[in-house]
């Protein structure tokens, strides 16, 4: 199971600091982009990320973007520009009204959204990747919602064969709940359990055993 640190930051300095602390252990990151409209919280912007010179000097790093924004078109255009400077892997879209499947653009299923709704709206296997949110998105530190884990089983039973991410409140208390399930995610996106850790090396070793 792959581990990707999830970075929810407000400033370029905070982003650089977190990447610097974690890049000895991880080379793939997910950055949350929130516009203060789709969710109340507001994060670093794509324009600010594009101006971080230090990211352009680290070619081994790759980045996912988790888009909690109303204007998906503008965000995708911004990521297109960023992709000329850094390696962009997957993009996750929460605003399903604006989603059109692309090779590197998948969806994020927020807790209120059912798998049945996704099946009605989309051809499942046209979606290259799906991220299941195990918290209400927008801020780190929110409570884990165990019922969201059943969506993994529902997707697999519906014939979905592409990768499934899980994001939200993943830590030493919730990982056992995830691992006891027959159907598990392919990738765990882990936020404050890593970014706020006093001993990142110890936590990275624990996660490496999953």
What are these regions (language model features)?
Residues 4-10, 28-42, 59-99, 103-119, ...:
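Catalytic beta/alpha-barrel core
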Residues 15-22, 71-83, 112-125, 169-188, ...:
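Catalytic cores of alpha/beta
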Residues 95-97, 131-140, 181-207:
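Glycine-rich phosphate-binding active-site loops on the catalytic face of alpha/beta enzymes
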Residues 37-56, 60-76, 175-195:
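A short alpha/beta connector and helix-capping loop motif
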